[in-house]
Swiss-Prot record:
It is found in: Nucleus; Chromosome, Centromere, Kinetochore. Keywords: Acetylation, ATP-binding, Centromere, Chromosome, Isopeptide bond, Kinase, Kinetochore, mRNA processing, mRNA splicing, Nucleotide-binding, Nucleus, Phosphoprotein, Serine/threonine-protein kinase, Spliceosome, Transferase, Ubl conjugation. It comes from Bos taurus (Bovine). SUPFAM superfamilies: Protein kinase-like (PK-like). Its EC number is 2.7.11.1. Residues 157-168, 563-582 have a biased composition (Low complexity). The modification N6-acetyllysine is found at K99, K718. This is Serine/threonine-protein kinase PRP4 homolog.
Length: 1008
């Protein structure tokens, strides 16, 4: 029979619920048969309920477990009261003696097996197994098969040698402490050995069992929340020696201060400890058992019995834990109080499996303080074989000695990780062995080792020692406290569950698993480490993500056909934290532009129409007024940039007629102003067949032609005016274009490509890539008073910043950026900055108040301050606003008016900046107050208004959004655009955003 039962311990963990019931019966051998029968009738319902509970939860689904678990404890409260009283009255029954012979046999077998294991363990230790496999192996060795016996025996420490002889005589009540300890030993043995028989137990005993399991859960509860813990500790403290009392007070103080939120983290690390060194727990629960038993106090005994059977139950999960040493602490996150009931147990193990490296670290740390303590104890503690009284004294001394040490050790950060690992291995090797027979113990290590199970054990043992009458009240009090606790437990569980939504069973403890609260001095310190480590791990994780994103962008930029994926949630922040090289930024933006081009080949008009629909309300209400407010200097009547000039009006002016029609034109190539007279159909430079007229600018007119030498490739030919100044300007533009093209051989920077140049009839002709429209025409055609879609504006802004980047690399100022000088391709996806007729080298910046078209003129130009690349940035800002709204941002009639409009947006110009202006006196008085020059509407005379302060009154965001009802993603982008414009339109060029910063701005980086 004994032989048959040994494997059953190993193979049938699911029997353990029933087994634990049985063990309580055996433990309560003292209960007389007739008493148990009397109670049987009284508790019949309860008994069956309890039994069915265990059956149900053997294989029930997790949802059922959850549901039942919530309500179970409420109904058990009253039962517990009755049960506790009943158990007090019960005596010991000799009913189980018949089984003891078998037990003795089984014990011998177990001892032999344990000896073999000890040798194995020693070999492992000596081989200094430090690998993860070694740890796992050791976990297996001290696994579920041994756990019952090993842990029970270890629980009953030094008396294991006398076990077999004493088992039979142990059932009588004896007042001396040693005999009660022995009795508990034999009881625990019986329990573990006869697990498989336990279902057959009789009714009265089953009732006791129920009580036991209940009170066990109570006890477990006791160990759950720090505040409650401190209560029971206070009581224990009463009976402790003064030094012990002091020490435990320190501990309790530490544990109490964080109270419930820390309890959660403590429980986490405790549960981790439990997982990793089951040995430690066992010793802890052992202490708990001993502590609660006094010869005088049957009540204490019954409570203990209960706690023991629970511990037995806890063994299965612990064994599982040992086998899976790397388990996620996350499940232990919520307060240990969470799932005490058996229903929780099955849900635990799967969770345990998923330990991230970070978490493994954490658990390592939390484990190590205990292990260290054990080691230090080993060296210091007196031999275990002292009499109980003496042992108590030496323990208290030891504890005194150990306290500072534990505190020192408990800062897990200070311990190197490999140290911890080796210690953990050592403790694993040692602890299973140390719990076995004295012989083996001697072989493996000095008896001293047995002493040092865990800090918990240390702090608990005094409690065990105090068997005074006070103990009895304490038992009573703690029982009622437990009942109270169980009431509040449900609420707390609910709370903690809501906190930790990801994992229902996070932090749950299998029934019988105790939260190791007494190591709170270690754990409190650890709380913070755990959080910090989480932070570090998060930072590390983000860094890895950023690198992945950057890699993606690199590959994409290399492959011009591919485009950037939309993963990076906030590339802006990631790039900034990495401080990426400008090249990275540029490549990323270039890739983004290509993606936009590919995705939006045919969607430009659709997106503009969508925006029109959003703006319908605004247009209906007040578009006519707005036209008056912002006079359009590019009205149809005098627009020299209208799409095709071979219209009736132009034909009447003699432009665009075929020269064959009028032979007199043959010698008269140039008109009075020096413009070339274009003839559709003529061939320029013997290869460019002119088929259309594009327009006329200050410096030139532009025709469309096909290159006969290049398979009729379309080109745009710019024919410079034939006068000395214009030729000079044309040659300067040619020089800048060549420089820019040479600096951008791959055409990534969106400056117009120059193919070649030639002279035709004394006019300098520049041959460019063909582009269909400029942005002024696009706005007129698609977005009049409405503007373009935010997607288009974002892409255009990316491309404009790239163009500015190239200009800066070449030390060139464009000095005339505006929608008219930005050309787009047929699909309106790619733009090119053109018309470098006003461009200059950055060093040659002559101070002139009329540089740049007025609406796009930066304030530093107007006041005559020196300028640099910031003037082009300002122009781009004005252009972007215009592209999104369809309205000119600063439609000033004069330079003075331009300053007023700019200050209406940004506030008064800084005095420091005003003082540097050559033309400051035209706009500011001696006190640097702004002199606003306006024409009186009545008298039509100029009047000057002195403004000492100008408060910003223009709301850029309101102007951008207007009356649009934007979806959330677009609204976000508009807010980002507003932020970008605020930084671009700084009055002081020194504070204006740089090109690199603009390229890293969220508006540019984040996709829609």
């Amino acid at each position: 029979m004994a032989a048959a039962e040994a494997p059953s311990l190993r193979e049938q963990p699911e029997m353990e619920d029933a087994n634990s019931e049985k063990s309580v019966n055996e433990e309560n051998g003292e209960v007389s048969e007739d008493q148990s029968q009397n109670k049987h009738s009284r508790h019949k319902k309860k008994k069956h309920k309890h039994r069915s509970k265990h059956k149900k939860h053997k294989h029930s689904s997790e949802e059922d477990k959850d549901r039942k678990h919530k309500h179970k404890h409420k109904h058990k409260k009253h039962k517990r009261k009755e049960v506790a009283d009943a158990s007090d009255k019960e005596g010991m029954s000799p009913a189980k003696r018949t089984k003891l012979d078998d037990l003795a046999l089984l014990e011998d077998l177990e001892k032999q097996r344990a000896l073999i294991k000890a040798e194995l363990d020693n070999e492992l230790m000596e081989g200094k197994v430090q690998s993860g496999m070694g740890l796992i192996l050791q976990g297996y060795e001290s696994g579920s098969e041994e756990e019952g016996e090993i842990h029970e025996k270890a629980r009953n420490g030094n008396r294991s040698s006398t076990r077999s002889s004493s088992t039979k005589g142990k059932l009588e009540l004896v007042d001396n402490k040693n005999s009660t300890k022995k009795r508990s030993k034999s009881r625990s043995k019986e329990r573990t050995r006869h697990r498989s028989d336990k279902k057959k137990s009789k009714g009265g005993v089953e009732i006791v069992k129920e009580k036991a399991t209940r009170s066990k859960s109570k006890e477990r509860k006791k160990s759950k929340s720090p505040s409650k813990r401190s209560k029971s500790q206070d009581e224990a403290r009463k009976s402790k020696s003064p030094t012990l009392r002091r020490r435990s007070q320190e501990k309790v103080g530490k544990a109490r201060s964080p109270v419930d939120d820390k309890a959660k983290v403590e429980d986490k690390s405790k549960a981790k400890d439990r997982k990793k060194s089951p040995v430690i727990n066992e010793s802890r629960s052992r202490d708990r058992g001993k502590k609660s038993r006094s010869p005088v106090d049957l009540r204490g005994k019954s409570k203990d019995r209960r706690s023991r059977s629970k511990e037995r139950k806890s063994k299965r999960p612990e064994a599982d834990k040992e086998k899976k040493p790397v388990k996620s602490p996350s499940k232990d996150a919520s307060s240990g109080k969470e799932n005490r009931s058996p229903s929780r147990r099955p849900g635990r193990s799967p969770k345990r499996r998923s330990l991230s490296p970070k978490q493994r670290d954490k658990s390592r740390r939390s484990r190590s303080p205990l292990v260290n303590d054990r080691r230090s104890k080993q060296s210091k503690s007196p031999s275990r074989t002292l009499s109980p009284g003496r042992r108590a004294k030496s323990r208290s001394l030891e504890r005194k000695r150990r306290e500072p040490e534990r505190r020192r050790l408990s800062s897990p950060r200070t311990r190197p990780r490999d140290d911890i690992l080796s210690r953990r291995e050592r403790s694993k090797d040692a602890s299973p062995i140390s719990r076995w027979s004295p012989a083996r113990r001697r072989a493996s290590r000095s008896p001293v080792r047995r002493r040092s199970r865990s800090p918990l054990r240390r702090s608990r043992s005094p409690r065990r020692r105090s068997r005074s009458p006070r103990r009895r009240d304490r038992g009573r009090r703690s029982r009622s406290r437990l009942r109270r606790r169980s009431r509040s437990r449900g609420g707390r569980r609910r709370r903690s569950r809501s906190k930790v939504k990801e994992d229902k069973f996070k932090g749950s403890l299998s029934e019988g698993m105790k939260v190791e609260q007494e190591s709170s001095s270690d754990d409190n310190l650890e709380d913070f480490d755990v959080e910090e480590e989480d932070e570090e791990a998060l930072i590390e994780q983000r860094r890895i993500q950023r690198q992945a994103i950057v890699q993606k962008y690199k590959y994409l930029a290399d492959d011009s056909n591919l485009s950037v994926p939309s993963e990076p949630s906030s590339p802006q922040s990631s790039t900034r934290s990495r401080s990426p090289s400008p090249d990275d930024i540029l490549e990323r933006v270039a890739a983004d532009v290509k993606e936009y081009e590919r995705e939006n080949v045919d969607t430009f008009e659709a997106s503009v129409k969508a925006k029109h629909n959003l703006m319908a309300v605004e247009q209906n209400n007040g578009s006519s007024q707005k036209k008056l407010l912002a006079p359009d200097m590019f009205t149809e009547s005098d627009d020299m940039f209208a799409a095709y000039f071979d219209s009736a009006r132009l034909r009447a002016a003699g432009i665009g007629k075929d020269f064959k029609e009028n032979p007199n034109l043959r010698d008269n190539w140039t008109d009075a102003e020096g413009y070339y007279r274009v003839n559709i159909g003529e061939v320029l430079d013997k290869r460019y067949n002119v088929y259309g007229y594009t327009g006329q600018g200050v410096f030139s007119n532009v025709v469309r032609a096909r290159d006969n030498a290049r398979a009729n490739q379309e080109v745009a030919v710019k024919i410079i005016r034939n006068n000395e100044l214009m030729q000079k300007t044309g040659l300067k533009e040619l020089e800048f274009l060549k420089k820019l093209n040479d600096a951008d051989p791959d055409d990534k920077f969106h400056c117009l490509r120059l193919f070649r140049h030639f002279y035709h009839k004394q006019h300098l002709c520049l041959v460019f890539e063909p582009l269909s429209m400029n942005l002024r025409e696009v706005l007129k055609k698609y977005g009049k008073d409405v503007g373009l879609h935010i997607k288009a504006v974002r892409s255009y802004s990316q491309q404009l910043f790239l163009a500015l980047k190239l200009l800066k690399r070449c030390n060139i100022l464009h000095a005339d950026i505006k929608p008219d000088n930005i050309l787009v391709n047929e699909s309106k996806t790619i733009l090119k900055l053109c018309d470098f007729g006003s461009a200059s080298h950055v060093a040659d910046n002559d101070i002139t108040p009329y540089l740049v078209s007025r609406f796009y003129r930066a304030p530093e130009i107007i006041i005559g301050k020196s300028y640099d690349y910031g003037i082009d940035m300002w122009s781009v800002g004005c252009t972007l606003y215009e592209l999104y709204t369809g309205k000119i941002l600063f439609p000033g009639k004069t330079n003075n008016h331009m300053l007023k409009l700019a200050m209406d947006l940004k506030g008064k110009m800084p005095n420091k900046m005003i003082r540097k202006g050559v033309f400051k006196d035209q706009h500011f008085d001696q006190n640097l107050n702004f002199m606003y020059i306006e024409v009186d509407k009545v008298t039509e005379r100029e009047k000057v208004t002195v403004m000492s302060t100008i408060n910003p009154t223009k709301d850029l965001l309101a102007d951008l959004i207007g009356c649009q009802r934007l979806p959330e993603d677009q609204r976000k982008k508009v807010h980002q655009l507003k932020d970008l414009l605020d930084q671009i339109l700084m009055l002081d060029p020194a504070k204006r955003i740089s090109i690199n910063q603009a390229l890293q701005h969220a508006f540019i980086q984040e996709k829609i």
